[in-house]
UniProtKB/Swiss-Prot annotation:
Organism: Streptococcus mutans serotype c (strain ATCC 700610 / UA159)
Designated name of the protein: Probable tRNA sulfurtransferase
GO function term, MF aspect, one: ATP binding
Compartment list: Cytoplasm
Binding positions (ATP): 183-184, 208-209, 265, 287, 296
Top EC class for this record: transferase
Domain THUMP, first and last residues per copy: 60-165
Amino acid sequence: MQYSEIMVRYGELSTKGKNRMRFINQLKRNMKHVLSIYPEVSIRADRDRAHIYLNGANYVPVAESLKQIFGIQAFSPSYKVEKSVPALEKAVQAIMVELHHEGLTFKISSKRSDHQFELDSRELNQVLGSAVFAVLPDIKAQMNHPNVNLKVEIREEAAYLSYENIKGAGGLPVGTAGKGMLMLSGGIDSPVAGYLALKRGVNIEAVHFASPPYTSPGALKKAQDLTRKLTKFGGNIQFIEVPFTEIQEEIKAKAPEAYLMTLTRRFMMRIADRIREERSGLVIINGESLGQVASQTLESMQAINAVTTTPVIRPVVTMDKLEIIDIAEKIDTFAISIQPFEDCCTIFAPDRPKTNPKIKNVEQYEARLDIEGLVARAVAGINITEITPQEESQDEVDVLIEDLL
């Protein structure tokens, strides 16, 4: 027997009252985006649950994709069966024979939405249970906590059988909490920050600062591949490439080395905020972890944050590096993050960066720079690409790495 559909149960959105259908419709859109790589699949989202119709698609990869989508509490693959007692008996017998092992206990749980069916739920439980005993006379029925709870649903068009309950990603559907601009480097931390923001329903757009020729095409592709990894949790993501070469060269030429990182990060924050404003975002998200590097002391964060009044969310701020790496490995971004491409945060990194920058000094050094002109030119030069849930090319990555060696 081959699975015909997957029944999806919603997560936290079940508590959202009058906004429930808005959350469900957003989840449906997200599922469509993520599952778009399976053209046979179709989706119906009702108030109590959603149905993923496989239409011949391979269940295994579809299920793996569903496990990643935020807003799903659990799901169950189902078999579609002719709506007749003989067909149901045959199907139930086939399933239980396949699952059977010594000591296995089972239960039949029937439910009818088609009340014209010839048997009520209790009668159907008895008939199908007897069918199981006919082929497995030694099997034991158990009403509380059986090994297998075989669910039978009688609908208008057919009957559906399921016994698995697979845990989903939980959280909220991406897009239900508004839009945020993720400051995405090529490192380990910022993709994890993006993942955690997605889990709480934030629709992220990835802002990546590129400084060619100091940063390579490989560094850009690395950031795009990290973004692609994040699409599996809620669908397409806008990737915003910011030209940052002029700004870094100006800072390098006109500011003391110890303040390079602080000034660079302040420009990044200004640009991310300008893009947020133009693209109707609500927050800025970054991967700062307290005390991990010089620019992530409380004093540095305060100096960098001073250029904006926009809320800055730091999902990994209290995590240590090993905790962040654990999540990066779980979401499959770690191997990409450690590819040997430098990003714009590392190319001009000072040997002894200021860990306690004074705002007065920072503003004095910035007075040497055309802040508004530099920011405006960077924002005017952005390049936006929509990243979709497609497979990244490992061959292309290997070629780019070879070019560095």
